């Protein structure tokens, strides 16, 4: 207990004597404060007649009224709420401030039944006074129990209350509250999400007390580690879109979403003011949306594989979190540069409209409802197209495949990234959520919501290979071989060298992601722990009755709950989904398999996986179908292979099994490879530093490789070092011959015939995929050195000191990584028809040259960029679509050129596409073809 003398001193500070140096005249600080209040409440223009706003304000008022009724208002109270007694426990104190913030919102939000209630305001202020004396003051330790509450959580709530009730708080009271915040959070010095929270605490407080120096410090704090600058290690956003927090955990949808929200709000607050953000690295924030969030949002849900321990929070299930991220995108759209603002609005509109499971408006603030409805109701804003992509997140050991109608997330770990996080009594059963886990999303939008995590069998997470019924400890792995390769941003291969030391379990696991199928392979599965080893094919939440139809090899299986079966000779399985269409799943087992299955009702509580005080302990029950392959006890060199076929009917799965589009090329502990015959794709993961071959691909080092052969005319190849530990090169040989090629920097082509040979310099590449494209041709000449002078090639880059002429103002950027060289030019989507960039090569000989362009692609680009090729016979105009195909060379035809600098390629910014978009000028390549 505080002494009487100390209490008296605190009360004197609160009520008497010292007068704060706070100006009361209307000024820029007042405008910023009112802007923040509007962000919190929606402002005076809020339309209470809108049904979604009314529902939100009604709930706000109901929650506030419930809290108010339960308050202890007595003069002798020893707590504010009995359920949150314990005035030194930071968890409880933080929760008290959060409740008071809700009450302050209800008292200041138009349409709330408690709007303007003077008694409510007075009781809130009395509670703040009591808390100052008993719980939150400068005599407290800054880090007791949980530092986050004292230094970040409580100050954020108190700042908001101070803004909302600003006109009701005396100068003395205000100064006391603000001084306390300054005691706990005087400056900004952390990383990632914690830094963003520090910045918002310091910044909003600075607005309240009118401190220009602190407000500038808050703004500048965004330029520090883990926010604006891309990370190259540790916490923060990476150039590939990854987000890491606590050094080794994938957290895009957890701490990353907090960075996004907090950064967006602070940038919005300061936009248009004296303290507007001017750091050029703020442009990285726009890229977060395209690279980090767009691929990981599925019809309103944020993928759980990047939410860390937050998946164990009952109030933060995937759609609620996804809605919060979309709210941040809506916020960014209010002040981002015009082309980004337009793109953000399109993305937000699509996600809001696609989520038929959970209303976006039910999870966001009244101000966000107001802003989002202005977007959704605007017929001139077209929703963005659904993502159709494959993306490798090398910096956080994740991969995602998105197709119209389904998506698959893959969560891995390594020596760099940990398997799962479980701290602060959260995520107690997260054991296998990042250990080769597959997350399949389809039209069953409730699959990972509605109590999935407290009821799913945590020992049997889909995709994993485990020692039956045993947990694993959190931490990084013992192997660096985790990662994969992306081909053309559409297809990919991933793998993980798995090792659970506690169970002497090792395995090599690969996933090959094509168009509408995902192939999973496992090899070298061995253990000496005396425990059955199994690979989990799926663990799918069923409908409320648990009677989803399913078949094996076309024969109906029992749908009764509590039924366990051993199915032998299984070639294919079909499981009906939970919706009328778009949620069925097929499973194909090449060569047949023995499958263990169990259909059961599972009961659990959120409290069992999250033991924090406010977590509900009510039992919930859900039904599941689990399928796994039993490798037996102490297996040695066991293997498996299966194919996931999302959204296929039983007839379609049966037809696929009869004539599969895939072929397993090899599945050993040395190399795993699959061919997709209809697409001309071959993927291969090479596990050792020995020369090995899979189909047409030979590699001398550990590597992930994918190729695509198109109509016997072109061969595309992508290569990565998934170990991120090779400080040299990977030598690749492809059993084809070629006549010409284009390749990323870092690739050296040494031979085109009779086979293609090239090396990839992966030193410092951090798992990046390197791309090359080969023009196929007959082997008629024996070994061909592509560097011979009779086949010269010349590249002119926008950054070259000679050979590049600009007309009009072009901006230089380097934010996108699918570029050639250090940077590229863009027209700022302005001055259409008045700008151009001309690339003039110095060609060593006259003759025919195939001309290629490279550009960093984005869906806000022009889709019909006008290109003039000046050649020996005149000028030819063509057009390219810069919305896709980034980072690779695109042929625009073959032309005759004279030797020297008489030829040219001019990229124009004429506005001929629909809609108009950015035009970029990056690099041009001239390759002699005869």
Swiss-Prot record:
Q: Which InterPro entries match?
A: CBM6/CBM35/CBM36-like_2 (IPR033803), Chondroitin_lyas (IPR008929), Gal_mutarotase_sf_dom (IPR011013), GH-type_carb-bd (IPR014718), Lyase_8 (IPR038970), Lyase_8-like_C (IPR011071), Lyase_8_alpha_N (IPR012970), Lyase_8_C (IPR004103)
Activity sensitivity to pH: Optimum pH is 5.5 (in the presence of sodium acetate). Active between pH 6.5 and 9.
Keyword Calcium annotated? yes
GO BP annotation list: polysaccharide metabolic process
Q: Where does xanthan bind?
A: 146-148, 246, 255, 309, 313-315, 424, 612
Location comes to: Secreted
Give GO MF terms, alphabetically. calcium ion binding; D-mannose binding; xanthan lyase activity
Q: Mutating residue 255 to F leads to what result? A: Loss of activity by 50%
Report the temperature dependence from the record. Answer: Optimum temperature is 50 degrees Celsius. Stable at 4 degrees Celsius at pH 6.5 - 9. 60% loss of activity when incubated at 45 degrees Celsius and pH 7.0 for 10 minutes.
Q: What class of enzyme is it?
A: lyase
Please give the activity regulation comment for this entry.
Activated by Co(2+) at 1 mM. Completely inhibited by Hg(2+) but not affected by other divalent cations. Intensely inhibited by NaCl and KCl at 150 mM, in particular by the Na(+) and K(+) ions but not the Cl(-) ions. Partially inhibited by iodoacetamide and N-ethylmaleimide at 1 mM but not by dithiothreitol, reduced glutathione or 2-mercaptoethanol.
Superkingdom of this entry's organism? Bacteria
User: Which residues does the entry assign to the active site, renumbered to this chain?
Assistant: 255 (proton donor/acceptor)
Q: Which GO terms describe its cellular component?
A: extracellular region
Disulfide links within the chain: none
- Keywords of this protein's UniProt record, alphabetized? Calcium, Lyase, Metal-binding, Secreted, Signal
Entries under Gene3D superfamilies matching the protein? 2.70.98.10, Chondroitin AC/alginate lyase, Polysaccharide lyase family 8-like, C-terminal
Q: What is its EC number?
A: 4.2.2.12
- Per the UniProt entry, the signal peptide is 1-25
Can you tell me which residues bind Ca(2+)?
515-517, 676
Functional note: Plays a role in xanthan depolymerization pathway by cleaving the linkage between the terminal mannosyl and glucuronyl residues of the side chain of xanthan to liberate pyruvylated mannose. Is highly specific for pyruvylated side-chains of xanthan and is not effective with hyaluronate, chondroitin A, gellan, heparin or pectin.
> What does the sequence similarity comment in the record state about its family?
Belongs to the polysaccharide lyase 8 family.
Q: How does it assemble?
A: Monomer.
Q: Protein name, please? A: Xanthan lyase
Q: Which organism is it from?
A: Bacillus sp. (strain GL1)
What taxonomic classification does the UniProt entry list for its organism?
A: Bacteria, Bacillati, Bacillota, Bacilli, Bacillales
């Amino acid at each position: 207990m505080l002494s009487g003398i100390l209490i008296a001193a605190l009360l004197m500070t609160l009520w008497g004597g010292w007068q704060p140096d706070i100006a009361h005249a209307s000024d820029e600080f007042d405008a910023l404060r009112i802007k923040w209040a509007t962000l919190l409440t929606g402002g005076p223009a809020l339309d209470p007649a809108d049904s979604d706003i009314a529902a939100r304000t009604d709930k706000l008022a109901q929650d506030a009224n419930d809290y108010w009724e339960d308050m202890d208002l007595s003069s002798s109270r020893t707590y504010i709420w009995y359920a949150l007694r314990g005035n030194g426990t930071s968890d409880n104190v933080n929760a008290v401030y959060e409740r008071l913030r809700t009450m302050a919102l209800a008292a200041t939000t138009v349409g709330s039944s408690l709007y303007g209630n003077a008694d409510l305001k007075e009781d809130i202020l009395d509670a703040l006074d009591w808390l100052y004396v008993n719980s939150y003051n400068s005599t407290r330790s800054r880090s007791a129990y949980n530092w986050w509450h004292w230094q970040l959580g409580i100050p954020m709530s108190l700042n908001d209350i101070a803004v909302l009730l600003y006109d009701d708080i005396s100068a003395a009271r205000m100064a006391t509250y603000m001084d306390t915040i300054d005691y706990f959070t005087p400056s900004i010095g952390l990383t990632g999400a914690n830094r963003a929270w520090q910045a918002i605490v310091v910044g909003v407080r600075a607005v309240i007390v009118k401190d220009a120096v602190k407000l500038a410090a808050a703004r500048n704090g965004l330029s520090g580690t883990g926010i604006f600058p891309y990370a190259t290690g540790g916490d923060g956003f990476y150039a590939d879109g990854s987000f890491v927090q606590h050094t080794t955990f994938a957290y895009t949808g957890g701490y990353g979403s907090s960075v996004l929200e907090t950064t967006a709000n602070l940038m919005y607050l300061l936009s248009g003011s004296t303290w507007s953000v001017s750091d050029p690295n703020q442009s990285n924030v726009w890229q977060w949306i395209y690279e980090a969030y767009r691929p990981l949002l599925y019809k309103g849900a944020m993928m759980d594989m990047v939410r860390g321990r937050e998946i164990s929070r009952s109030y933060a299930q995937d759609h609620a979190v996804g809605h919060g991220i979309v709210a941040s995108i809506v916020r960014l759209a209010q002040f981002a540069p015009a082309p980004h603002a337009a793109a953000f609005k399109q993305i937000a509109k699509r996600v809001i409209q696609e989520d038929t499971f959970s209303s976006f408006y039910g999870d966001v603030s009244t101000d966000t409802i107001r802003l989002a409805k202005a977007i959704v109701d605007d017929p001139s804003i077209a929703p963005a197209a659904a993502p159709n992509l494959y993306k490798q997140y090398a910096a956080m050991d994740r991969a995602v495949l998105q197709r119209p109608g389904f998506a698959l997330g893959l969560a891995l770990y390594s020596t760099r990234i940990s398997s799962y996080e479980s701290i602060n009594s959260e995520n107690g059963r997260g054991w296998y959520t990042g250990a080769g886990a597959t997350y399949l999303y389809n039209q069953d939008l409730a699959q990972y919501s509605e109590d999935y995590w407290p009821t799913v069998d945590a020992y049997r997470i889909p995709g994993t290979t485990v020692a039956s019924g045993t947990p694993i400890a959190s931490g990084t792995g013992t192997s660096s071989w985790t990662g994969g390769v992306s081909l053309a941003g559409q297809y990919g291969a991933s793998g993980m060298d798995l090792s659970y030391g506690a169970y002497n379990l090792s395995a090599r696991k690969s996933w090959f992601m094509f168009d509408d199928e995902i192939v999973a392979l496992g090899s070298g599965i061995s253990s000496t722990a005396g425990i059955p080893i199994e690979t989990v094919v799926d663990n799918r939440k069923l409908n409320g009755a648990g009677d989803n139809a399913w078949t094996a090899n076309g024969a109906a299986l029992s749908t009764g709950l509590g039924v366990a079966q051993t199915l032998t000779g299984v070639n294919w399985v079909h499981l009906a989904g939970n919706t009328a269409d778009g949620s069925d799943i097929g499973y194909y087992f090449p060569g047949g398999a023995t499958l263990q299955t169990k259909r059961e009702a599972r009961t659990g509580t959120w409290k069992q996986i999250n033991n924090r005080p406010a977590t509900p302990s009510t039992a919930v029950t859900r039904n599941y179908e689990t399928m796994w392959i039993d490798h037996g006890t102490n297996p040695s060199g066991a293997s498996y292979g299966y194919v996931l076929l999302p959204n296929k009917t039983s007839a379609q799965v049966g037809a696929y099994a009869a004539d599969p589009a895939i072929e397993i090329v090899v599945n050993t502990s040395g190399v795993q490879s699959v061919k997709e015959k209809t697409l001309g794709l071959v993927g291969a993961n090479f596990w050792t530093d020995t020369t090995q071959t899979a189909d047409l691909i030979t590699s001398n080092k550990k590597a992930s490789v994918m190729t695509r052969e198109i109509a016997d005319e072109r061969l595309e190849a992508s290569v990565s070092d998934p170990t991120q530990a090779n400080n040299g090169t990977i030598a690749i040989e492809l059993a084809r011959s070629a006549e010409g090629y284009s390749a990323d920097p870092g690739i050296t082509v040494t031979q085109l015939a009779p086979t293609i040979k090239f090396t990839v310099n992966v030193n410092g590449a951090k798992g990046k995929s390197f791309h090359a494209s080969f023009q196929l041709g007959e082997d008629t000449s024996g070994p061909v050195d592509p560097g011979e002078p009779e086949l010269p090639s010349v590249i002119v880059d926008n950054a070259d000191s000679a050979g590049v002429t600009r007309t009009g103002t072009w901006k230089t950027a380097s934010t996108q990584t699918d570029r050639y060289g250090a940077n590229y030019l863009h027209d700022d989507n302005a001055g259409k028809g008045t700008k151009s960039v001309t690339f003039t090569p110095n060609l060593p000989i006259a003759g025919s040259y195939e001309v290629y362009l490279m550009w960093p692609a984005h869906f806000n680009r022009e889709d019909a960029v006008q290109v003039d090729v000046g050649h020996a016979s005149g000028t030819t105009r063509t057009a390219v679509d810069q919305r896709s195909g980034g980072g690779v060379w695109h042929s625009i035809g073959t032309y005759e050129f004279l030797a020297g600098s008489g030829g040219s390629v001019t990229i124009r910014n004429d506005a001929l596409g629909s809609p108009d978009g950015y035009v970029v000028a990056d690099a041009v390549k001239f390759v002699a073809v005869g």
